[in-house]
Amino acid sequence: MAARLKEKFIKEIRPALQKELGLENTMAVPRIEKIVLNMGLGEATQNSKLLDPLVADLAAIAGQKPVTTRAKKSIAAFKVREGMPIGAMVTLRGDTMYEFLDRLISVGLPRVRDFRGVSTKSFDGRGNYTLGVRDQLIFPEIDISKVEKLKGMNITIVTTAQDDNSARALLKQFGVPFRQTA
């Protein structure tokens, strides 16, 4: 069975976007390519044991095992050597991507304190959207009693859109709650 948002995209969102953007070919309609979750752990340079519970949290949120990111260069000011683990990331594609986006929109974002919508300025100019989350507790997969350290993450939604306006229209159709600008 396909993910709920994937079916919604095929049946409702794609035809609506095609009409809205004035495209003739359905394959030209922008779609979500992948979602990348990145958790930077600068403190892991001093104590590598901090990395394990946060990697486990990221695995629970994403539903697949994250890869640890390592430092590309040594930086003396940050006490970082080349090859030291400094974070974790996961790339979601296909059904798991749609399921994660569904959980993020319907469960995760509404649990953020003082949530008024996500920023409309976080597009990169090439149709991709990046969103910062301050703590991992907004996801129901995380057991609050087992969390030792609150850690935020970056969530990047990569689309096939050529510009920000078509990407914004795509995400709005998916139900991403953008902040109302007064």
UniProtKB/Swiss-Prot annotation:
NCBIfam families: PRK00010.1. Keywords: Ribonucleoprotein, Ribosomal protein, RNA-binding, rRNA-binding, tRNA-binding. One of its GO terms (biological process) is translation. Belongs to the universal ribosomal protein uL5 family. Pfam families: Ribosomal_L5, Ribosomal_L5_C. This is one of the proteins that bind and probably mediate the attachment of the 5S RNA into the large ribosomal subunit, where it forms part of the central protuberance. In the 70S ribosome it contacts protein S13 of the 30S subunit (bridge B1b), connecting the 2 subunits; this bridge is implicated in subunit movement. Contacts the P site tRNA; the 5S rRNA and some of its associated proteins might help stabilize positioning of ribosome-bound tRNAs. Signal peptide: none annotated. InterPro entries: Ribosomal_uL5 (IPR002132), Ribosomal_uL5_bac-type (IPR020930), Ribosomal_uL5_C (IPR031309), Ribosomal_uL5_CS (IPR020929), Ribosomal_uL5_dom_sf (IPR022803), Ribosomal_uL5_N (IPR031310). The gene is rplE. It comes from Acidobacterium capsulatum (strain ATCC 51196 / DSM 11244 / BCRC 80197 / JCM 7670 / NBRC 15755 / NCIMB 13165 / 161). One of its GO terms (cellular component) is ribosome. Part of the 50S ribosomal subunit; part of the 5S rRNA/L5/L18/L25 subcomplex. Contacts the 5S rRNA and the P site tRNA. Forms a bridge to the 30S subunit in the 70S ribosome. It comes from the Bacteria. This is Large ribosomal subunit protein uL5. GO terms for molecular function: rRNA binding; structural constituent of ribosome; tRNA binding.
